[in-house]
Amino acid sequence: AGHMQGKMIGDFLVANYDDVDLNGDGTISYAMMKGDEANIEAIYRTQYGVEDANAVLTAAGKPALAYFDAANPDCYQVDLGGAWSAAAAKDYMDTNFVSYNEDAGNMIELVICNNDGMAEGVIASLQEKGYNVAGAHVVPVFGVDATDNAKALIADGAMTGTVKQDADGMAAAISQTAAAVAEGKAPAEALGGLSDARFTIAGDCASKLFVAYAPYTGE
């Protein structure tokens, strides 16, 4: 999901760079909301959401993203309760706005979130400050999960994108595997016979299948 989110962010920024660069300094400043300190998925999403976005930016001749708070070596703000919560993300953004805003010339120009719940909290904070509402500047906010709330926020123009599990790919994997097992093949053999680019066999377990994520920016 982190890889998919990062590429989606990079592609969006390349297409909309000047609009996102609020202070016109040529670099996009970002905040990162991490769901949990130790969760491996949170770690990977935090890492690759930025790394893969930077890869796209670099390929397009653009500078890498700059974390908004140079005094924070972690380059993220984490839900200390490990709950991936909207409340934690909103609290962080409310606090960030005190020192980082348009008047000060150092506004956060992009927010990357480990999940859609945290994205909701960020958007609530932005909207209280007059952003991400009809007729106002939209700070791009990206999440993961493609929840119904996130889809509604995207439809309203308040959220830019999220990442969803490929439901069609999941259904195809189940159908093809079930058919192969019904023909007498062992599960590992059945999975190995799949020929869809949406599927990846786990390197450490021949009977484990990964189904690709897909970007979501609206219906």
Where are these regions (language model features)?
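A residue-level marker of the well-folded mature domains of exported/periplasmic proteins
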Residues: 1-219
